[in-house]
């Protein structure tokens, strides 16, 4: 991957293809989830496909404490500016749904459209009750991480989201992805998974998003993501839905085409 300096940090990125720009923002934990889309001929042959690793992941500048959603959005904007991209279709997965929506709120002229691949519940849910409802799942996982076993914590989280064979499934389309996730555990648990991060999305913010929006969910995903879709419709009436048959939260990692 290439490197670029933006906002005082170095990010890794890659580009493929030509045409209208599409930027993929990865979710929490697995930095290269955009790879299956970037190499997909149906996309690469018609679009300029851009993917990057957020700060704290892979070979990017390591983080010193939590990174805010706004900072991640600023990083994406700065990357696009460095690549001389005035406008891009923004595709996001899981946690990065917050980043993409913040980007659309802060700099709407940069975002041509939004594709939300099962964004995190924090998009539309109050972090405190949400944290309480997820405690039975996240409690044991965080205990493992705080005990110093980052690999077990990563495995516990993604087994809950992706299923027990997630490492084999991810490796099929993102070679080395699970191993990199183990190395990036500190960024996942010390920044991305901190409840709320003082981030808010409501009617005032939603009114600034007038671009086309697509919400993609999997037919085998947790019911929680269906609830998120319903709640987002109240804020974004222009949003369209699509369901990927046979997919869970892995979505495009399980079915790239």
Q: PLM ranges: what are they?
A:
Residues 244-256:
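Catalytic histidine-centered segment of alpha/beta-hydrolase-like enzymes
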Residues 70-88:
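Conserved acidic catalytic loop of the alpha/beta-hydrolase fold
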Residues 2-65, 79:
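Conserved HGGG/HGGXW glycine-rich cap/lid loop of the alpha/beta-hydrolase fold
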Residues 86-128:
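Conserved hydrolase catalytic core segment
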Residues 28, 219-221, 246-248:
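Acidic beta-to-alpha connecting loop that harbors the catalytic carboxylate
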Residues 148-188:
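Conserved alpha/beta-hydrolase catalytic His-Asp/Glu region
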Residues 178-234, 240-243:
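Conserved serine/cysteine hydrolase catalytic core
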Residues 24-28, 94, 218:
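Glycine-rich His-Gly loop
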């Amino acid at each position: 991957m290439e490197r670029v300096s933006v906002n005082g940090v170095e990010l890794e990125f890659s580009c493929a293809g030509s045409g209208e720009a599409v930027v993929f923002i990865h979710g929490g934990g697995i930095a290269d989830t955009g790879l299956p889309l970037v190499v997909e001929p149906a996309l690469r042959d018609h679009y300029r496909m851009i993917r990057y690793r957020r700060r704290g992941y892979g070979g990017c500048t390591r983080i010193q404490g939590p990174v805010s959603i706004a900072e991640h959005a600023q990083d994406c904007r700065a990357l696009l500016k460095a690549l001389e991209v005035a406008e891009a279709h923004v595709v996001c997965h899981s946690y990065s749904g917050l980043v993409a929506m913040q980007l659309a709120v802060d700099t709407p002229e940069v975002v041509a459209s939004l594709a939300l691949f099962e964004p995190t519940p924090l998009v539309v849910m109050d972090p405190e009750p949400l944290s309480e409802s997820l405690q039975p799942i996240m409690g044991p996982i965080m205990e493992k991480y705080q005990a110093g076993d980052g690999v077990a914590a990563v495995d516990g989280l993604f087994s809950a989201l992706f299923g027990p064979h997630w490492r084999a499934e991810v490796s099929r389309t993102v070679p080395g992805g699970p191993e990199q996730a183990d190395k990036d555990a500190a960024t996942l648990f010390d920044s991305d998974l901190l409840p709320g991060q003082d981030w808010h999305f409501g009617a005032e913010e939603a009114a600034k998003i007038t671009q086309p929006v697509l919400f993609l969910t999997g037919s085998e995903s947790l019911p929680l993501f269906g609830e998120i879709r319903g709640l987002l419709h109240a804020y974004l009436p222009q949003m369209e839905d699509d369901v990927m048959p046979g997919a869970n939260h892995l979505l495009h990692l399980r079915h790239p085409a």
